[in-house]
Amino acid sequence: AGYYETDYQKQMFKDIKFAIHSGKLVAITGIIGCGKTTTLRRLFDVLEKEGKMIVSKSLCVEKKRTTLPTLIAALFYDLSTDKEIKIPKDGEKRERELRNLIKKGKKPVALFVDEAHDLHYSTLTGLKRLIEVVEDSGGILSVVLAGHPKLKNDLRRPMMEEIGYRTTVFSLEGIVGNQREYIEWLVSECTIDDTVSSDILDAEAIELLATRLRTPLQIEQHLTLAFEAAYRVAVKPVTTVIIESVLSKQIDDLEPTLTRHGYDVSGLAEQFNAKPAEIKLLFRGQLDPPRARELQEQMLAAGLPL
């Protein structure tokens, strides 16, 4: 359907670009389905086409196992012009060669890392120090991290102070506040020119979707389900009854809400010194009330949405 962008998103895009050119850690955070990966791709493509920076991207999919050497390797692969790329195993030699490689390119460098909420704090600390190593030699290296809101909350933790205070964080709200406009735009983009949205979607149905859903991913999924359900029972336009029948009843429950923010059972158990079984009982509303209150207070203090 193309790319939908609000005025707020357009301004944020400009602000992110400016921060990237400054040579620092930049974090873009947002819930699942809000458009982080799409924004990251657009940033990468725009910077690459402008030609003022050299852009690099980590392709490693196992982010929980991704270490600083893995990300440095991504820089070597994207910056080197040699046919055979040899990355030194010795840390001192590796960093020196990378520094020289960046100086040789005579342009600022930006490294893009998606799903960065899974990176270990030692990896994030290493990236911060790598930026400083490059800066000391007169070069500019920016690292652009994209991840769930967990990344933003982690950067605020006391143990992450060294990195958090030096990171420019952008919270991507996506289409929040513009859901109705997004639905109407999406329908117009996906139908033939003379189709009116009211012919296939009741105004009340649009309002219900806009009220209950927050992200493009949620809206696209539920619109597809609604059109399929309406087709099966030969109903046109789609009504609120159809929408209610396909809306997930658990969409705003605690577990899916925290999942959209990047938290799972094991991660929550580790962060709040709880047993996985306690977290599962909390999700089901079956945990002992005093213990439930204790965990909820800790989670609220850490910035989790309860």
Placement of each model-derived feature along the sequence:
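Post-Walker A helix-loop "phosphate-sensing" segment adjacent to the P-loop in P-loop NTPases
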Residues: 46-55, 80-83, 135
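A short hydrophobic beta-strand->loop->alpha-helix junction that borders the nucleotide-binding pocket
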Residues: 32, 55-65
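Conserved NTP-binding/hydrolysis module of P-loop NTPases
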Residues: 62-85
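A short, basic N-terminal segment
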Residues: 1-26, 305-306
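The catalytic "switch" region of P-loop NTPases
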Residues: 107-109, 126-200, 204-206
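Walker A/P-loop nucleotide-binding motif
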Residues: 22-42
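Conserved P-loop NTPase "ATPase switch" module shared by AAA+ and STAND
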Residues: 101-123, 127
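C-terminal alpha-helical "lid" subdomain
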Residues: 188-192, 196-306
